[in-house]
């Protein structure tokens, strides 16, 4: 009797994947042959998410799913992962990208703005990791990639809440790496610098010039720069990389 060693078709859940970095990650994973669950935070964005998922399916021949879920809510995060597992039969990759900002100086920051950022960026990552890890442990395989930020590594004035949430993601990732490595599950954090997204589009020209002046590469990053790194960390080839924080910032943090 010949043992079946064929690699199963891999599937991925990408939170916050209807735009920006998350959208680029979903596209990159679909291009690499992963079935992809696209996520938006509420029903308002579901039509757009479904259209994006359908385009991925048509362009890359993979299976897709679009799910509206607020990852800050544990029940909705569980429902998101459960829906992907039911649709694809397994969940091999989780990319925690969903995140928000509520910037302001500490002395004037409202408690609700601090709580909202922590709830989505950190608690949301925890909720999805918990839901996915339970399934990954049973199948003895998994890749978890959590989006942190260079702000979580070095801090930034006016972003105490965001920096705290992204630093928390780093600590969570390292703890998960220690807990899950024996089950063939890796957990890594990607810490982007300034990437050309809706958030950076809101910057003034003067702010943009000041930021670019701090970057060795003298340009903002593209979402695709981040997506390619995530795709590698989500692959089987990255099986001996875990608990790491990889900055992708064009040399800004040198």
Identify what each model region corresponds to.
Residues 18-20:
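Conserved glycine-rich cofactor-binding loop
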Residues 88, 129, 137, 141, ...:
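C-terminal substrate-recognition "lid" of short-chain dehydrogenase/reductases
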Residues 129, 165, 173:
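Active-site helix of classical SDR
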Residues 32-51:
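Conserved glycine-rich Rossmann-like NAD(P)H-binding loop of the short-chain dehydrogenase/reductase
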Residues 149:
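Residue(s) in the substrate-gating loop at a strand-loop-helix junction
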Residues 105-106, 110-118, 200, 211:
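Substrate-binding pocket helix/loop in short-chain dehydrogenase/reductase
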Residues 134, 178-182, 239:
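Alpha-helical segment proximal to the catalytic Tyr-Lys
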């Amino acid at each position: 009797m010949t043992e079946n060693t064929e690699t199963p078709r891999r599937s991925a859940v990408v939170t916050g994947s209807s735009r920006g970095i998350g959208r680029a990650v979903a596209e990159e994973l679909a291009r690499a042959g992963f079935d992809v669950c696209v996520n938006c935070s509420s029903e308002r964005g579901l039509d757009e998410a479904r259209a994006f998922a359908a385009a991925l399916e048509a362009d890359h021949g993979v299976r897709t799913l679009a799910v509206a879920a607020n990852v800050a809510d544990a029940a909705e995060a569980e429902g998101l992962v459960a829906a992907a597992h039911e649709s694809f039969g397994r969940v091999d990759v989780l990319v925690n990208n969903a995140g928000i900002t509520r910037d302001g100086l500490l002395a004037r920051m409202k408690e609700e703005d601090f709580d909202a950022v922590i709830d989505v960026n950190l608690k949301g990552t925890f909720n999805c990791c918990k839901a996915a890890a339970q399934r990954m442990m049973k199948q003895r395989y998994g890749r978890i990639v959590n989006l942190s930020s260079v702000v979580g590594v070095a801090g930034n004035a006016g972003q105490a809440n965001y920096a705290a949430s992204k630093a928390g993601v780093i600590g969570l990732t390292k703890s998960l790496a220690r807990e899950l490595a024996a089950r063939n599950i890796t957990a890594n954090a990607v810490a982007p610098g300034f990437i050309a997204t809706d958030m950076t589009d809101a910057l003034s020209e003067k702010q943009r010039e000041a930021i670019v002046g701090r970057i060795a590469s003298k340009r903002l990053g593209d979402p695709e720069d981040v997506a390619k790194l995530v795709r590698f960390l989500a692959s089987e080839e990255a099986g001996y990389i875990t608990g790491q924080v990889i900055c992708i910032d064009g040399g800004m943090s040198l």
